Amino acid sequence: MEEKKKTPEREEEQALPVQELPTDIPAEVRQKLAEDLNEQATEDLKQDVREAEKEEANDEEVKANPEMLTKSRLLKLLVKKQYVKLREVTEEEQPADLAELLEELDENNRLVVFRLLKKDVATQAFAYMSDEARDDLVNAFSDVELVSAIEDMSLDDAADLLEDMPAGVVKRVLEKSSRQTRESLNKLLNYPESSAGSLMTPEYVRLRQGMTVSDAFAAIRRQGENAETVYTCYVVERNRLQGVVSARSLLLSDPSTPIVDIMDDNVVTVKVTDDQEYVAREMQRYDFTAMPVLDNEGMFVGIITIDDAIDVLTDESTEDMQKMAAILPDDDATTYFGTSVWTHAKQRIPWLLILMLSATFTGMVTTHYEEAFVSLPLLVSFMPMLMDTAGNCGNQISTLMVRGLALGEVEPSDFLKVLGKELRVSAIVGAVLGLVNGLRIYLMYTYLYAGQYDNVIGYAVVVSVSLFFSVILAKLVGGMLPLAAKKLGADPAIMATPFITTIVDACSLILYFQIAQAVFRGMM
């Protein structure tokens, strides 16, 4: 059997002796690690290594990158107790990549590796991990570890983490945290959920009006390590925001230039009570990487950075998509595979039950026109096409309206504008679909089913005219319902696909049979 080629780095790992646990790890954590890395655990790790190697054997990315840090390589370092080497290789990884790798490990191995990481590396990786993986770690942490993690995290991330913890745990952690951290976190935790205040961080670079560019650079060096961003600095006097200065402006200015000469005093701000989605849209609108936040008295209290804004937009988009697909949104849901089968079912069943019961109206319409089926059974074959086409047309415009309302491109006050535009659009779409469908029916039943059906032209006219008016109806219903929902304070996404399909189906059938009765009056 051909022996696997070893890279110089892998050979070095094989040659390294067993190493003691790093001395900078707190004694309590060292004790836990010693228990987790006993002989039995090492045997279990060896089995995990073998399974990981099987998984990676057919991974093209691993084959193309022999130096890549993989799950099996990480576990091998644990088995061989090469803790210093483990720290070195993890330190070279991007925090996001390391977080992804840690999530591939089972809960016990993830905890062991995380405890072995250097403090700054662990903190950075922790910020990129999924909520589920972070919760697993937090539940296993001692109070000492949890306080240490909170102290090292940015304040907004720490506040987000504490929000999901039991009140008793939060109280213990805050009591053991430094006074400055405790006061800052208490302020953030007191802001309403989903508000700008709950999203912001008070960690920013603060400048004064009397500074020069040279003084500003000195201030950045002092404050920058703990600041959320150094790309934008804030000129503040008596807790009131006077202006902003970009790093670009500072770099391109003479060191002796006064800050007031280069700062922008026309600053766009938001209030702590503003909705987080509104803040994210404003940042998107102005192309900001950070947004200043003021309290109700106009005092400058913090900033919201672009990474948090992106998270908000992603969450809101996901929630809208779930509602439009008749799925109940779940704040605790993670990824598709990270969500349990029961949770998936629980999210989908309620709306599906409502829609199934609402289909009773469609059934009642069909039953009412039962005599038409007996007289002209061919009418039944066109019903699926008619309802599907009308439903698709309604879904098209409702999706555009929900998006437009979310982005602020459309307002409920634009009701008449939307109505006029959709009347014209639907007339064109309905005419094209009606003509093509009429031609299809005529050719199909004249030649393919020649002699089997009478009055083919009559059927073509009934279906095409019904389709024309159904498309117009669907476009109007799909466009108007989200606007009406927004006006009434309801969520427009709820009025999208689920309700529109049901309404349009029933109305399309009524139109269809009424037109059929008019054309085939003597036959029904």
Task: List the predicted regions and their residue ranges.
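Alpha-helical transmembrane segments in multi-pass membrane proteins
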Residues: P95, W351-A359, F382, L386, ...
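Re-entrant/interfacial helical elements at transmembrane boundaries that shape
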Residues: S381, N395-A406, P482-K486, T497-P498, ...
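Juxtamembrane "helix exit" motif at the C-terminal ends of alpha-helical transmembrane segments
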Residues: M356-F373, L435-G451
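Non-transmembrane, extramembrane segments of multi-pass ion/lipid transporters
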Residues: D308-H344, N395-G420
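Membrane-water interface of transmembrane alpha-helices in multipass transporters/channels
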Residues: H368-F382, Y449-V462
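Short helical (or helix-break) motifs at transmembrane helix termini and adjacent helical loops
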Residues: D320-M321, M387-R403, T502-L509
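Membrane-interface segments at loop-to-transmembrane junctions
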Residues: G338-Q347, E411-S426, I457, V461, ...
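Hydrophobic packing positions in regular secondary-structure scaffolds
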Residues: E2-D331
